[in-house]
Every structure is written in structure tokens, then in C-alpha cells.
Design a protein with these regions (language model features):
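Secondary-structure edge/capping motif, primarily at the C-terminal ends of alpha-helices
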Residues: 81, 107-114, 167, 171-174
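Amphipathic, non-transmembrane alpha-helical scaffold segments
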Residues: 14, 63, 67, 71, ...
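C-terminal peripheral helix-coil segments that are non-catalytic and often amphipathic
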Residues: 1-8, 94, 133-144, 162, ...
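Hydrophobic alpha-helical connector segments
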Residues: 65, 78-105, 157-160
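Amphipathic alpha-helical packing segments from all-alpha helical-bundle domains
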Residues: 119-145, 154-158, 166-169
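Helical hydrophobic small-molecule/effector-binding pocket
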Residues: 89-113, 125-129, 197-200
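Generic hydrophobic, amphipathic alpha-helix propensity
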Residues: 13-25, 41, 66-70, 74, ...
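Helix-turn-helix
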Residues: 2, 20, 24, 28-61, ...
Length: 200
């Protein structure tokens, strides 16, 4: 959590040019391009190495910072989709539909480089914890509104919030018949349908 706080503080200190460079790096990763060193990236972006080090102290931290920014943008899209709905259960369904895209083809290109980075775990854990908290709050509201059965909302939130990351792991990925996103959506629908009350 300390690492995530440092990332947030760092993002507040970045200037307009730094943010533009991060957009360029995001575009590079989106296109599947890579860079071996900070110096290599500086050449590709046609900037000074010093400017790059103002954003992050290492290649590893730069990738983590960029992916953190991408996930926050995606989180905002999920929250906007949720807020467009009226009832807690509809909000939950909309939120999860977008949240599961985090393990879809596009965002997987960003998260895949994190697999071998030790410093990425805290950042990924932070985002998963945030998603789980949103899910639990919506489940609690849905239970109060009698839209779902009287369930253990914490356990259900942990399950729904961790599906994508679970199926994205190399250990399980090779055995899936569908993509992690499709599998997560399939199981999410089964779980939600199983806890809904008839009047919802």
C-alpha cells in the first residue's frame, strides 16, 4: 500500500510534458512495442534520459507507473458505467462487465509485462482490493434492497473481484477454452443469477 501511495504522490508531481510522454509510452505498449533499457526508450521517444528519470527511477518502475495509470483510467470507465444504472444489482452488473475487461486482449498487453516485476504486486493488489471493495458495497446495498439473497457479501466480493486475475495466471490460462475475460464474464453471470431474488 505504501508503494501505491508513492505512485499516487508521484503522479501529482508530473508536469504536462511528463504526462504526454506517458501517453506515448502507453501507445507503445498498446501496439506491442518494447524497450530494453531506459536509454533505448529515450531514443524511441526522442527525449532526454533525464526527462525519463523524472518520471520513474527505473524501467521496472516506469512500466508499473504506466500500467497503474491505464488501470485507473479503466476504473473510471467502470465507475461511469455503474453510475449510469439505478439499482445496486444493475450497477454491479455494469461495473463487473467493464472491470472484467481488465483481463481482455487490450489491457492484457499492459498487464502481461508485470508478470516478472516484483514491484508490480502491490500495485495490482491495490487495484484488486479497490474493485473488491466496490463490489462488496454494491452487494450490501443490493441485499438491503432485497435484490439478492442474504449472502456473505465479503466472500462473494472476493470471488468476483479476483476472477480475472485468477484466470490470467499462466497456471490456469493454458487450460481455458475461452479467454480470461470471456471466462470471467461467464462465471460472473452464473454467480449473479444465482444470488438474485426473483423481483430484481
Amino acid at each position: 500500500m505504501k508503494s501505491q501511495a508513492a505512485l499516487s504522490k508521484k503522479s501529482l508531481q508530473l508536469g504536462k510534458r511528463h504526462l504526454e510522454l506517458m501517453d506515448e509510452l502507453e501507445s507503445m505498449l498498446d501496439q506491442g512495442k518494447s524497450f530494453s533499457t531506459m536509454s533505448d526508450l529515450a531514443k524511441q521517444l526522442k527525449i532526454s534520459l533525464r526527462t525519463l528519470y523524472e518520471i520513474a527511477p527505473s524501467k521496472e518502475e516506469l512500466i508499473v507507473t504506466t500500467v497503474d495509470r491505464v488501470l485507473k483510467k479503466h476504473g473510471k470507465i467502470a465507475m461511469d458505467a455503474m453510475n449510469a444504472q439505478s439499482s445496486p444489482i444493475r450497477k454491479l452488473e455494469s461495473f463487473l462487465a467493464v472491470a472484467n475487461q481488465a483481463v481482455g486482449p487490450r489491457l492484457e498487453r499492459f498487464t502481461q509485462p508485470l508478470n516478472n516485476l516484483n514491484s508490480s504486486k502491490q500495485m495490482v493488489d491495490y487495484h484488486e482490493q479497490y474493485i473488491t471493495t466496490v463490489i462488496k458495497n454494491l452487494l450490501d446495498e443490493a441485499r438491503i434492497n432485497k435484490e439478492i439473497r442474504d449472502i456473505d457479501t465479503q466472500a462473494t466480493a472476493l470471488l468476483l473481484g479476483g476472477l480475472g486475475r485468477y484466470f490470467l495466471s499462466k497456471k490456469h490460462l493454458k487450460d481455458l477454452k475461452q479467454t480470461p475475460e470471456e471466462t470471467s464474464n461467464f462465471l460472473t453471470e452464473i454467480i449473479i443469477d444465482g444470488i438474485k431474488l426473483e423481483n430484481s
